[in-house]
């Protein structure tokens, strides 16, 4: 039996259906408010608005819960690899051995990009930001793969998702190599997804890169933790672009552009800069006071989240992962950024100012320290975020095209 909410406008009462969620909050259907009541709803930033039906990711920000297709993010980070999670997001279930092997082979098969794409990279200045290069390169893929400009059946959606998941890491590594003046390194299909990415990032034609298993496992976890996160800014951008029928390469390029914003994907670089500014553990109280001062421009980066009003479950995984990486590299006891971060977190979590405002460490707080220890420069942080989030973008894009209720997005 359908329940209704009542909306009174002037002297007339309108009944709005209450849609039952499979988990989480119920939703009031306002889709007919304009046609029946001649009014629009106003919700800046979509703070209370659900834009679609989705079964991919669930977040309970009050409890600090993140699940993909019903699986807890901590379990996935500890027990799965990135392509298993990619399969889960796209198809709705974890793969069996045959499905996993077939999927990984398809991804490896499509990792190579058209050789002519190399010429596009040469048009950029050597000082160009890798995100700028990546944005242009991904958008240009529609010129190299015109067979996916028109898609009509499920097989097209699957091929598109696989191609995108396969080629984005190659383009990400190429963007880095070009920015530092090194030759491109081709994908190696004998390596798994994460190993191959590290190989393309750090190998050179004259020197092979030996993948440290601790580094590989850490990057695998980072990719899993960044794979999808409901209808965030970049995912919503991909869905809105996709609602017009735009080709998937164009859609993902819009997601990359949105992710590049400092309030979205650039926060972990800001955390590193903040920790450097603080400089030492002794300076933390001074900067805590600055963060509380509304007249001071200093902001405590890596704390707080639009959705989470509890400890971000991804941050908890990354805190331990950070310690594992630094221990492997012999930096656990002498890394100044980690020492500042741990002490800053400890002080903030006991401070009433932060407790009252529910400001807890988020996923960006420790990820930058891990990247830096791996030898990944700050300008590449958001590129790696995009590499992981491509999986979520494609799962959401595929779900949108398979949803009969979806229309072209047109806010008023």
Curated annotation (Swiss-Prot):
Keyword line: Transferase, Tricarboxylic acid cycle
Source superkingdom: Bacteria
Claim: Hydrolase is one of the keywords in the record: no
Name assigned to this protein: Citrate synthase
Span of the signal peptide: none
Gene Ontology biological-process annotations: tricarboxylic acid cycle
Miscellaneous: Citrate synthase is found in nearly all cells capable of oxidative metabolism.
């Amino acid at each position: 039996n359908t329940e209704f909410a009542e909306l009174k406008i002037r002297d007339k009462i309108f009944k709005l259906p209450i849609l039952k969620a499979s988990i989480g909050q119920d939703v009031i259907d306002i889709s007919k408010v304009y046609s029946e009541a001649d009014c629009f709803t106003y919700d800046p930033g979509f703070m209370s608005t659900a834009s679609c039906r989705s079964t991919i990711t669930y977040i309970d920000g009050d409890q600090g819960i993140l699940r993909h297709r019903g699986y807890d993010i901590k379990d996935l980070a500890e027990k799965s690899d990135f392509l298993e999670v990619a399969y889960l997001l796209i198809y709705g279930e974890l793969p069996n051995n045959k499905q996993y092997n077939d999927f990984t082979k398809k991804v490896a098969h499509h990792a190579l990009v058209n050789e002519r794409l190399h010429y596009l990279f040469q048009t950029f200045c050597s000082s160009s930001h890798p995100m700028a290069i990546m944005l242009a390169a991904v958008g240009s893929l529609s010129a190299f793969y015109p067979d996916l400009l028109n898609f009509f059946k499920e097989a097209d959606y699957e091929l598109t998702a696989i191609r995108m998941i396969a080629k984005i890491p190659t383009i990400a590594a190429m963007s880095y190599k070009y920015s530092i003046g090194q030759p491109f390194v081709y994908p190696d299909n004998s390596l798994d997804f994460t190993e191959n990415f590290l190989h393309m990032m750090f190998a050179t034609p004259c020197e092979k890169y030996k993948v440290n298993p601790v580094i590989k496992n850490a990057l695998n976890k980072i990719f899993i933790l960044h794979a999808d996160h409901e209808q965030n800014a970049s995912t919503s951008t991909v869905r809105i672009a996709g609602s017009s029928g735009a080709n998937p390469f164009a859609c993902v390029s819009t997601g990359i552009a949105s992710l590049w914003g400092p309030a979205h994907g650039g926060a972990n670089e800001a955390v590193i800069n903040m920790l450097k500014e603080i400089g030492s553990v002794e300076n933390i109280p001074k900067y805590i006071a600055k963060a509380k001062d509304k007249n001071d421009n200093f902001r405590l980066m890596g704390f707080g989240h639009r959705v989470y009003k509890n400890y971000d479950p991804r941050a908890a995984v990354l805190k331990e992962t950070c310690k594992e990486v630094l221990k492997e590299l012999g930096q656990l006891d002498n890394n100044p950024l980690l020492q500042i971060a741990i002490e800053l977190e400890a002080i903030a979590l006991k401070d009433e100012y932060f407790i009252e405002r529910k400001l807890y460490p988020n996923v960006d707080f420790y990820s930058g320290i891990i990247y830096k220890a791996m030898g990944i420069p700050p300008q590449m942080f958001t590129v790696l975020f995009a590499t992981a989030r491509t999986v979520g973008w494609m799962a959401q894009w595929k779900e949108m095209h398979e949803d009969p209720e979806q229309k072209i997005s047109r806010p008023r």
